[in-house]
């Protein structure tokens, strides 16, 4: 073999060896930069988990492998210690670590029975009893509505587990058809299972990740399939988190628009002013006025409202209403005369219907 070809082969072998030692690129699998925050990592996992779940890709022979890689990437990068080890030593430095079930990770975001990929509620077999659904109000701040967030909910969930012995049950009932004569049939419902393995309800701690999506609306619900009340003879109900946006001391939400009031002095209302409003994510909204601002005047800042839930690239407006703080001390006669001369404005005393048109 020529020396040049031998050198190329050695370089290729070294590259392959280095790649094998380095292992999988978890950042690339999740599609996030190495500087990604934990919120970015959770958001990326949740989005990709829906796309790559094997049940949604039955024709892809690598679907299970892709889903497992995604779960492994999330398990490492969502844990600060594992992430630090991975950043320093690569995947090889994690070989001795405990690995979680990727199905368990998925259930933290979507529930025990996964996600209904057809976009429709799970089909219910009427012959299978089902536990009650649970609806829990989840309070979120306007800051979370603006920027999005992941809320970790830890709950004690009653779960049916096997116990010694047998029990009577109604878990399986079938319709039996008996022919009574020509053209005559009788249908009866019969229990076809006389005894089942005994079960008992035990409390298990469950950690669920609820994604508060930007622009989420008050009253919207996030379902977790199979996380509701258990049923010893059937399947558990669902758990639904209902969004309840708490009142904000500065901003009021109306659709995708935000409303707020700003109080300025009488001097500022006459000669103008500059100021900044701190927005929900901390950025500053600058206001500059070089003309008279009347009490009740409104200023619209387009694109400074909340993100639209269906399209986060579209944002509403910030509507600012100005209040004027008049001096509380009485003016001297000299001051009054000075103001009259300065403004040079005559008397305007007009009486009219200010609510006309309503």
Swiss-Prot record:
GO molecular function terms listed in the Swiss-Prot or TrEMBL record? unfolded protein binding
Q: What is its main location?
A: endoplasmic reticulum
Q: Which residues are the signal sequence here?
A: 1-22
Q: Where would you find this protein in the cell?
A: Endoplasmic reticulum lumen
Q: Report the glycosylation sites.
A: 261
Per its UniProt record, what PROSITE patterns does this chain match? Answer: DNAJ_1, DNAJ_2
GO CC aspect terms: endoplasmic reticulum lumen
Enumerate the InterPro entries for this protein.
DnaJ-B11-like, DnaJ_C, DnaJ_domain, DnaJ_domain_CS, HSP40/DnaJ_pept-bd, J_dom_sf
Which residues get modified to Phosphothreonine?
Answer: 188
J domain span: 25-90
GO annotation, biological process: protein folding; protein maturation
* Post-translational modification note: Contains high-mannose Endo H-sensitive carbohydrates.
In its keyword annotation, does this UniProt entry include Chaperone? Answer: yes
Keywords (alphabetical) are:
Chaperone, Disulfide bond, Endoplasmic reticulum, Glycoprotein, Phosphoprotein, Signal
Q: In which tissues is it expressed?
A: Pancreas.
State whether it acts alone or in a complex, and with which partners, per the record: Part of a large chaperone multiprotein complex comprising DNAJB11, HSP90B1, HSPA5, HYOU, PDIA2, PDIA4, PDIA6, PPIB, SDF2L1, UGGT1 and very small amounts of ERP29, but not, or at very low levels, CALR nor CANX. Binds to denatured substrates in an ATP-independent manner. Interacts via the J domain with HSPA5 in an ATP-dependent manner.
Q: What does this protein do?
A: As a co-chaperone for HSPA5 it is required for proper folding, trafficking or degradation of proteins. Binds directly to both unfolded proteins that are substrates for ERAD and nascent unfolded peptide chains, but dissociates from the HSPA5-unfolded protein complex before folding is completed. May help recruiting HSPA5 and other chaperones to the substrate. Stimulates HSPA5 ATPase activity. It is necessary for maturation and correct trafficking of PKD1.
- The name of this protein is DnaJ homolog subfamily B member 11
Q: Which organism is it from?
A: Canis lupus familiaris
What lineage is this protein's organism placed in?
Eukaryota, Metazoa, Chordata, Craniata, Vertebrata
